[in-house]
A protein has these predicted regions:
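NAD(P)H-binding glycine-rich loop region in Rossmannoid oxidoreductase-like domains
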Residues: 1-32
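Catalytic helix-loop patch of NAD(P)-dependent Rossmann-fold dehydrogenases
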Residues: 25-43, 47, 52-53, 57, ...
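Glycine-rich "substrate-gating" loop/helix at the edge of Rossmann-like oxidoreductase active sites
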Residues: 81-84, 115-127, 147-159, 186-190
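Alpha-helical substrate-binding/gating segment
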Residues: 104, 131-143, 154-182, 199
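Conserved C-terminal active-site "lid" loop/helix of NAD(P)H-dependent oxidoreductases
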Residues: 157, 164, 180-181, 216-238, ...
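Non-catalytic, hydrophobic alpha-helical segments
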Residues: 160, 164, 184, 194-197, ...
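C-terminal "lid/loop" region of Rossmann-like NAD(P)-dependent oxidoreductases
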Residues: 179-183, 192-198, 203-223, 265-272
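Amphipathic terminal alpha-helices
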Residues: 243-278
């Protein structure tokens, strides 16, 4: 009904159950949201003649993780050890199946996008490193981390968002050339271990302290990197901020929020720093 009323030209699908450890506790919900949510959306697209382009945003964790040092490319195999990762791989497979079976022949162009570990102000989710760090800092508590040597491709939230919008525009104007999977990750130097992130944040916030959780943990990937060469070459998309800048902006946003600042005035300069790309 919402699709019929809105009659959109372009659809961006970002809704998800986004947490790995939560997926162990609630696997049925995770698959229902991440897999059947994609199916339901694409069925709605099929029944909405106005739609010409669709972008399904999944995750870097959709790849079959081989725990190697090389960044994953878009043509690597889908996989996933845990319910969250595998549900996103399923969403990718559903996307490809609907493209081949229904949407391409109907003139609807669909692509998928895979970003890294996105950070930035306003993320209040539980079980995420930087929100957990900020909550512990504000409460004067010790930060407990579970996987200090796990490496992730960290990036500021505006970076992949620009990639998504650029890709959606090209899908709408040049459809078939861009109807495929795309990575939007940071430069390889910004793929760092959790311990590096925590130590950097603590160097900027001397009152912060942390320790490792000694309890057994559920399985999570140890090494994860993305190769975004295709987006750089074909879309002209490149990361603009390194990891230190991204972390600094995230801390500044949070401190401004604590002071009661008008957050649009805080966030808009961050957007302008990425100009002319956004």
């Amino acid at each position: 009904q919402a699709m019929r009323e809105a009659r959109p030209d372009v659809v961006l699908h970002l809704a998800a159950q986004p947490l790995v450890r939560y997926s162990y506790a609630e696997p049925v919900e995770t698959y229902a949201v991440n897999v059947m949510g994609t199916v339901n959306l694409l069925e709605a697209v099929r029944q909405t003649p106005s739609v010409k382009a669709v972008l399904n945003v999944t995750t870097d964790k959709c790849y079959e993780n081989r725990e190697w040092v090389w960044p994953y490319r878009e043509n690597e195999a889908m996989g996933g050890f845990d319910p969250y990762s595998s549900s996103k791989a399923c969403s990718e497979i559903v996307t490809a199946a609907y493209r081949n079976s229904f949407l391409d022949s109907a003139g609807v162009k669909i692509a998928s996008a895979r970003a890294g570990n996105v950070i930035g102000g306003g993320d209040w989710a539980t079980d995420r490193l930087i929100p957990d760090f900020l909550r512990a800092l504000d409460a004067g508590q010790l930060l407990i981390i579970r996987s200090p040597f796990a490496t992730r491709p960290w990036q500021y939230v505006l970076e992949p968002l620009f990639g998504y919008l650029s890709l959606a525009e090209r899908l709408f104007t040049d459809g078939s050339t861009f109807a495929e999977a795309w990575n939007f990750g940071p430069d390889e130097a910004d793929s760092q271990p959790v311990k590096w992130i925590v130590e950097y944040l603590c160097s900027k916030q001397p009152d912060a302290a942390w320790q490792c959780d000694a309890l057994p943990q559920v399985h999570e990937a140890n090494i994860l990197k993305l190769d975004s060469s295709k987006a750089k070459a074909r879309l002209g998309w490149i990361p603009r901020w390194n990891l230190q800048m991204a972390l600094g902006m995230t801390l500044d946003w949070h401190q401004s929020w604590k002071r009661g600042a008008e957050m649009a005035s805080v966030s808009l300069p961050a957007k302008s720093l990425l100009s002319p790309v956004i």
